């Protein structure tokens, strides 16, 4: 029950336990737990927008954790805030992106629809490359970036994809370089059908001119999505790993051999 949850965070015992865990540096995980890096983006009290919880706590003479819980109790879902838990050091991030041991994969946004919107990793990487080049600090060429997002991934996972070759299945994304702008970082909200809630999304409307799957135009700027997308077959197919051998049944032992991979790169 929502009311019980808000009542819970006002219990002195709960807050004391919460502060204890926040201060335990050896158990820090994905989030750094530093409320001085928790910045208010939306609040009925507009004077608080742009401030972090430590600043608010200093103004009211309370601990940053208490400032956070007090505001959360008072404004509930009308209070919005953000923090940075990754990619805070560009020079390190550039090295990681350029490393042959790094893949630009997926975000965990699908499991956190109300708090994360990192669906556009590939576009965000292209913006990192573009921004660095404009600053005269290029760490990767455009061609290397596209290769890392396509052929590099396909070759690693043994998929017949990621290359443009005569006779291949036509899976193509047409990107407008001028659309790789600050909008790539903007977060929007959109209704999630069937659940009665809004989820966080990133639009990137100016970045993608068209998406072609298996030779069929799935999306075209201005025309939006094909009416058959997600309803009719033909837009995609199962991509089999070409490194996996066929499973064979050993009739004598009645056992099944496990798939064998040709090689791993570590």
Regions found by a protein language model. Give the residues of each.
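C-terminal cap of metal-dependent C-N hydrolases
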Residues: 95-102, 107, 121, 174-231
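Flexible loop/turn segments at secondary-structure boundaries
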Residues: 74-78, 111-115, 153-156, 180-183, ...
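Hydrophobic alpha-helix feature that most strongly marks membrane-spanning transmembrane helices
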Residues: 73, 101, 127-134, 150-154, ...
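Alpha-helix capping and helix-loop boundary segments enriched in small/acidic/polar residues
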Residues: 113-117, 161, 199
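Intein/HINT protein-splicing elements and their conserved insertion hotspots or analogous self-processing inserts
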Residues: 219-266
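Hydrophobic, well-ordered secondary-structure elements that form the walls
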Residues: 61, 108, 126, 145, ...
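Acidic, glycine-enriched loop/beta-strand segments at the rims
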Residues: 79-87, 93, 140-144, 154-189
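Active-site neighborhoods of metal-dependent hydrolases
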Residues: 1-139, 178
